[in-house]
Design a protein with these regions (language model features):
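Glycine-biased, low-complexity coil/linker segments
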Residues: 15-17
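A short, conserved structural fragment
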Residues: 371-381
Length: 407
């Protein structure tokens, strides 16, 4: 019952406020992981210049909000920041002073709620004892650590910058100074047995981290992993292995008190990610830095994924982004995807209220085969994947998308 109350109150508290999130993309990494297709550079030459440009964009985006408030007479001027998230890339390549400088810039230009969640993504090789102590005295109150695996062979195959010993050592240290810690683990890795995957999870549990994000290894175009597979040097990931690992993950974590609140995310009570949940619950967010995305409820924008072009635009006092106005179908499809992936599901009354009866009828019709196959279920007017359907959620969602609709 306690978990049930927390799940509903968590969503209500986020949805009931008019604020949003700020995401800051730090586009630098020490080396390129083989599977990664996010935007980053392994050259640190422009790091200091980038930090200053990001600070300037924070001011420019606030000015944009103020302009919107004046022209549209909406509440943009009073928009409060509830979470700040440093992602990348590898944000832990910044010095603590640089991180604190950017946080101070957020506070300077925006209204920030009391005790906001402030997350730093970090790699184990950056988290020495000295750095962890330093961060624990900073404004950062949540760490998201890219462990990925506790096995040397997996880390080598992924071309991670840390080794297995560093993965364990950083958690041993981090848990002494931070309560709110999330780690990333990757499953479906070629050659990884069910027993090894179980051991990865058990190792994470031993350190007592309260949040785990876990993703299947995917092969993206233009990555080193894709090239290695095409050359036959690495075996391609198998769906059946990923599904077996997913089931082990869900069963093990739920047995150990974790709530499976989003397809790839598991949290103990009081440790759900407020930042990511803001995205999933349809709240507004501002993305700062190269390749960062923003959403205001009506439109989506994205910054140029090129460090040099980003810096040039900011120097010329131009926001380096493109924008699209979302159609009703776009917003419906997004809600279907995020809703099905979360524990809160898709509320049928919200579909009718926000999108109309045509969309509701379409959703009910498209869902019928999945309900019949026990992959989806409707309870209390909420559409959700069943345990049997969870692993297939993304594919199911795409079949429920509204297409060929003339606005």
């Amino acid at each position: 019952m306690a978990s049930s109350n927390y799940i509903s109150s968590f969503a209500s508290s986020l949805s009931g406020r008019s604020g949003g999130a700020i995401y800051i993309h730090i586009p630098f990494c020490k080396q390129a992981c083989h599977y990664c297709d996010f935007h980053f550079s392994t050259s640190m030459k422009k790091k200091e210049e980038m930090v200053l440009a990001i600070a300037k964009e924070l001011q420019m985006r606030k000015n944009e909000l103020l302009d919107c408030a004046r022209s549209d007479k909406n509440d943009a001027e009073f928009w409060e920041v509830e979470t700040i998230y440093f992602g990348g890339g590898t944000p832990s390549v910044l010095t603590t002073e640089e991180i604190e400088f950017l946080i101070a810039e957020v506070y300077h230009h925006y209204n920030v709620v009391e005790n906001p969640e402030i997350t730093l993504e970090a790699n184990p090789d950056d988290l020495t004892r000295e750095r962890i102590v330093e961060l624990s005295k900073s404004s950062i109150n949540r760490l998201s650590i890219g462990i990925q695996s506790f096995f040397e062979a997996d880390l080598a195959m992924m071309n991670r910058a840390h080794n297995a010993a560093e993965a364990q050592k950083c958690l041993e240290l981090a848990t002494q100074y931070f309560d709110n810690i999330s780690i990333d683990l990757i499953y479906g890795v070629p050659g990884m047995s069910n027993a090894q995957w179980q051991q990865n999870i058990e190792t994470a549990l031993r350190f007592g981290v309260p949040h785990i994000s876990s993703y299947a290894l995917t092969v993206e175009p233009k990555t080193a992993l894709n090239t290695l597979i095409q050359k036959g040097k690495i075996e391609a990931p198998k769906d059946e292995v990923a599904e077996a690992h997913f089931q082990i993950l869900v069963e093990t974590l739920e047995k150990n008190g974790f709530i499976h609140y989003e397809l790839s995310n598991f949290g103990k009570e009081n440790y759900f990610s407020k930042n990511n949940s803001a995205y999933w619950l349809g709240k507004k967010y501002i993305g700062i830095g190269p390749s960062a995305h923003s959403y205001d409820g009506i439109s989506r924008s994205w910054n140029v994924a090129n460090n040099a072009l980003y810096l040039k635009a900011i120097q010329q006092n131009q926001l380096p982004n493109e924008k699209e106005i979302l159609s009703t179908a776009d917003r419906y499809n997004e809600y279907i995807m995020t809703g099905l992936r979360t524990i809160w599901g898709v509320a049928l009354d919200r579909i009718e209220r926000e999108f109309g009866l045509d969309y509701l009828d379409y959703l009910i019709k498209q869902s019928e085969k999945f309900v019949k196959d026990e992959l989806l279920a409707i309870e209390n007017n909420i559409l959700k994947p069943t345990s049997k359907g969870k692993f297939l959620t993304d594919g199911i969602a795409s079949d429920l998308f509204y297409i060929n609709l003339e606005e």
